[in-house]
Amino acid sequence: MLAPQPFMKNFLDKFFSRSKNLDYISQKLKQITLTTPANKIFEAINNFSEKSEIRYVGGCVRKVIKKENVDDIDLATNLTPLEVCEALKNKQISYYETGIEHGTITAIIDEYKYEITSLRKDVSTDGRHAEVEFSLDWKEDASRRDFTINSIYADSDGNLFDPFNGKKDLEEGYINFIGNAEKRIQEDYLRILRYLRFYLNYSNYKHQSQIIKIIKKNIDGISNISSERLIGELKKITSSNGLLKLLKDQESLELIEIIFPQLKNIKNFKKLNSYAVENFLKIDFIFLISLLVIDGTDNADYFLYKFKISKKDQKRLKLIDHFYREKVTLNTYTEKNLNKFFYFNGRQAVIDIINFKIFNSNTVKKKLI
């Protein structure tokens, strides 16, 4: 028997690799259905009528394909929101209607929350939110989504509906807008930050120059977005090792600096000491923000003015900022002084000021570790 030619071998390798991945995707989604309360929602919707359907969509499908941890589950259905409510009532599943005007009902089972969104088509947009009509067309719903990698649906058996080849883009490392990129951005300017997040997480290629031009042309539209949504997206971008990836991509970094000019210390992360590098993934978002914005000026106060965070987090950030503005030397970190600081401010505050000193030092003194 003749050995396959090189081009044929490459084709066969890719074919069997994709086939194996499809088996994994199917098995993983079946596992999620069987081992989480999602199975009750699938049963409630699928049994509502002969034509009712429900599928996994968006981030949970994307994460399964990339073999990432699935931390939340979004669902799409061809039922209207009122029909979804009726279907859930029939199975005694609790829900609330907070997002009903946008087509989303949130089901609650065993303290788990599942967003169930009706298929939609956009009627009008204002750069923040869209006015929608409900639809029965799965492809029409997919066409209004932002990126091909987020327009992949899957039923409870793991069968994919992928009208824009999002799975292929995801596996090959392409971040492609659906349709006209500028139109997609102008529908919701938060998509600029979402593009950066997905690019940093999944792309294997340089930015398309045309996409960067479009983003820069429309970047002022970010001012239309609420501070809560901006902070939420920044948190996702900087989670895990996203910030370290950002520092290696100059175009992404420049865009982040335009959108968040308060992050004045961001380039300092290029020269972290060895201890800081080793422990970087252990720090939480608010402490990360302290490292990014506290610089001895009113910058931290300005950040808190621009962006809404909880009062508890505000207090924590202000405490680190106040401490930094004092004339702090290594002698400040004596056991006596730290005990006094602990007495007035608590354990977390002591940890924060020590870590803040460590992360802002070129080398780390043993007495701080």
Which residues does each predicted region cover?
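Catalytic cores of the polymerase beta-like nucleotidyltransferase superfamily
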Residues: 3-369
